[in-house]
Amino acid sequence: MSKAVVVFSGGQDSTTCLVQALSQFDEVHAITFDYGQRHSEEIEVAKALTSELGCASHKIMDVSLLGELAISALTRDAIPVSHELMDNGLPNTFVPGRNILFLTLAGIYAYQLGADTVITGVCETDFSGYPDCRNDFIKAMEQALNLGMDKQLNIHTPLMWLNKAETWALADRYGKLELVRNHTLTCYNGIRGDGCGDCPACHLRKRGLEDYLSNRDAVNAELTKKTGAN
C-alpha cells in the first residue's frame, strides 16, 4: 500500500498537492503546523478541507516555539506585511527555519506511519524569494532525512517548476478549481477565498488565476509539457 504525508496549510498550493496526492496514493495523511501564524484561521480551513476531501488522518501539531524564535510579519501581528524587501533581500513574511522544521517533523511522522513520501507545495518558479522553497534546499533536506533516519524518504514537490497559472490548471485538472478558489486560505491577512486582495500572496494568486482563465489552452499545454500528464 502506497502512503504519503502532505504538509498542509489549507492554502492554494498545499490543497492542490493534497488533491493530487489523493488520486495517486492509497493512503494520504495530512499534517498542519500551528506556529502562532498571523493567518491562524488557516488551521480551521485545513480541518474543513481534509474532512471534505477524505484524508486518512489529519494531524495538527503545535510548534509555537517557531513563532517565538522567528520574528516575521507572519508571526508578529505588530509587524505589517510589506511589499518591500528587507535589507537582506527577503520579504518580511519569510519565517526563518519554517520549512526546515516542517519537513523534519513531517519526515518523522512519515517514518512512524510507514510512508515513504512527504509532499510539500513549495515552488521555485513563484517562490516569493523564500530560500527554503528552492529545489536545492529540498534535495539537501531529503538527503539529510534519509541519512539521519536510515530510511529512503522522498520529498515530492509537484509544484516546484509550475507558475501560479499552471497551479490553477492542475487543480482544474482534478476538478477542484472552484474548491481551491473559494475554500482555501492563501491570504496573509487571514481572509478565505479571494483574500484581502492587497497582500503579496493575494496578488500572486489573483494574477495566476487571471492568467489561467484567459489562456486556458496555452497554460494547460504548458502544464502537460512539464508534468507529462493529460
From Swiss-Prot:
Catalysis performed (reactions): 7-carboxy-7-deazaguanine + NH4(+) + ATP = 7-cyano-7-deazaguanine + ADP + phosphate + H2O + H(+)
**Record note on cofactor:** Binds 1 zinc ion per subunit.
Q: In which pathway does it act?
A: Purine metabolism; 7-cyano-7-deazaguanine biosynthesis
Q: Where does Zn(2+) bind?
A: 187, 196, 199, 202
Asked if the record carries the keyword ATP-binding, the reply is yes
Enzyme class (EC, first level): ligase
Designated name of the protein: 7-cyano-7-deazaguanine synthase
The gene name on file is: queC
